[in-house]
Every structure is written in C-alpha cells, then in structure tokens.
Regions:
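C-terminal beta-strand-loop-alpha-helix "lid" module of Rossmann-like NAD(P)-dependent dehydrogenases
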Residues: 1-292
C-alpha cells in the first residue's frame, strides 16, 4: 500500500504533467485558428481562379492539357500529407491505415511531413521524395510538391497521382481523404473543383468579356498549372488545420484526465491520512488506558 509521501509525489508529478499538456493545448489552439483562417482566406482566391478557368474553357473549345491525359493506371504515386510531430491522437494512425489499400509493387510514395516519411521507411514502402511545409504553407512549398508530381506523370513514370491527407471538418472531427491530383479533369470540372460555378449555370456575379493575349489557350496552359498549385495549397492548409485541431483535443483530454487523476489521488491521500490519524489516536488511547 502506498504511503502518504508516495501519493504526494505522484500528485505533484501529475500536476506538472497537466501544466505541460495545458500549455501545449493553448499553443495548438492558437496555431489551429491561424491554419483555419489561412484556409478560409484562400477560398475566395481559388474561386476567382476557377471562374477565370471556366471563362477560358468556354472560349477555347475542347481544350486539352498534357496533364489531362487519361491512360490505363499501371503505376501510381501517392502523396501522403501528415504531421512533423506526434501527440495528435489517432490522426496519423487513421491516415496510415488507408495506405494498406495500395499494391506495393506498383505504387511509389511521396511523403509530406516527417511522420509519413518515418512510417513509409519503417514499413519498407518505396519512398521517392520527402517534402516539408510550414504551418502556413508558402507558395514555393506547394509548387515544389506540384512540380515533382507533374514530372513523374509527364515522364510516364506513373499513370496517376493521388493525395492522401486528413480533411478538416471541424475542431472535433477530421477524416482521412483521398483525392486524385493527376490526371486533371476537364477544364470545366477543374474550375468547378476550385469553387467556380459550372459553365452555363446561373451566377449572381456580373460577367465581363476579357481580351486575352496572345490567346486563351496560352493563358490556359499557365493557369492550369497555377490551379494545380492551388489544389496542393488547399490540401496542405486543411492538413495543418486537422493536425492542430487533433492535437488541441488530445492535449485537452490529457489535461482533463490529469485533473481527474489529481482529484482521485487527493481523495486517496486524505483517506489514508485520516486512517493514519485515527490509528495513532487509537494507539494513544489504548496506551493511556493501559497506564491508567
């Protein structure tokens, strides 16, 4: 049976742990708000780009880009986007569980974040590249990932590129999501994914006629690549929002559990202390009666 000294030491240790998890909860909460705000601020920009692609697609007829080439999928690349650190509940475990669906002999992997890189290396999967990204991803980081995927596809090394990441739903809910990055859909579908209204659909915004130089197709060739970068950026922002949300919830649960444990240990300490006092009083009373 533990002594009162042992219980006091354990209470002190648990309180110290609770202070650490509380601080980590506050940091994750602050980062989560920034990541969510970054995703929200990005949406209008992505929508405007989608509107422009939609307008160009209507003017350029049956536009086709090399990244839109559809072929039989014999080899596939998967971009796995996850965290650099742990302590985020089951977020990484739930995401990595989805990797079991892929045939290792025909699939190569691209890690975005340290945790997926470590997992892929540990499970002996074919890791061809590793990328890092900040809490608010820079355009250069998004472009590097996008460019690497484009090169694999255009050189014929893979026939399709998927992105596996954790989709942000709300603070308490994040879900693994699989998105096809390459080949790209048609121009109209690509614009719709970016948030634009489908061609011919009613729109509340005023329409304008644009004059493109040198021609819509040349502009489209550039814009399609930008839209691909935007899709990568949106995925990275959602992954970061999911990470910080999961970490905040995990640290909050750890803090709550520590506080409950402190209450339980304090009650146990008081009971043991009361029992010791009662025992000492009985011993004193018994000794007094024996002397009397």
């Amino acid at each position: 049976m533990p002594s009162t000294r042992d219980i006091r030491r354990r209470i002190k240790s648990v309180k110290s742990t609770a202070q650490i998890t509380k601080a980590m909860q506050m940091v994750a909460s602050s980062k989560m708000q920034k990541a969510q705000q970054g995703a929200l601020n990005f949406r209008p920009f992505a929508k405007m780009a989608g509107d422009l692609v939609n307008h160009l697609a209507a003017d350029s007829g049956d536009y086709r880009h090399p990244l839109m080439e559809t072929r039989e999928v014999r080899k596939r690349a998967v971009i796995v986007v996850s965290t650099d650190k742990g302590l985020c509940g089951g977020l990484n475990a739930n995401l990595f569980r989805e990797l079991s669906k892929y045939d290792l002999s025909t699939t190569q992997f691209i890690a975005v974040g340290r945790k997926p890189a470590q997992y892929l290396a540990r499970t002996r999967r074919k890791l061809v590249a590793e990328f890092a990204y900040h809490d608010i991803p820079t355009y250069a980081e998004c472009q590097a990932i996008s460019k690497f995927a484009q090169d694999l596809f255009l050189k014929g090394e893979v026939d399709a590129v998927d992105v596996l990441y954790t989709r942000f739903i709300n603070t308490l809910s994040q879900r693994p999501d699989l998105r096809l990055l390459l080949p790209l859909a048609s121009a109209q579908s690509l614009a719709t994914e970016a948030g634009a209204a489908p061609a011919g659909a009613p729109d509340d915004h005023q329409h304008f006629d644009f004059l493109f130089e040198p021609d819509p197709v040349t502009v489209m060739d550039k814009l399609v690549l930008y839209l691909l970068d935007f899709r990568v950026a949106q995925i990275l922002l959602e992954a970061k929002a999911s990470e910080h949300s999961a970490r905040m919830v995990a640290m909050k649960n750890a803090t709550d559990n520590a506080e409950q444990l402190v209450k339980h240990l304090t009650l146990e300490y008081n009971k043991l202390r009361q029992s010791n006092i009662t025992k000492e009083l009985l011993e004193i009373s018994s000794a007094a009666m024996a002397l009397g």
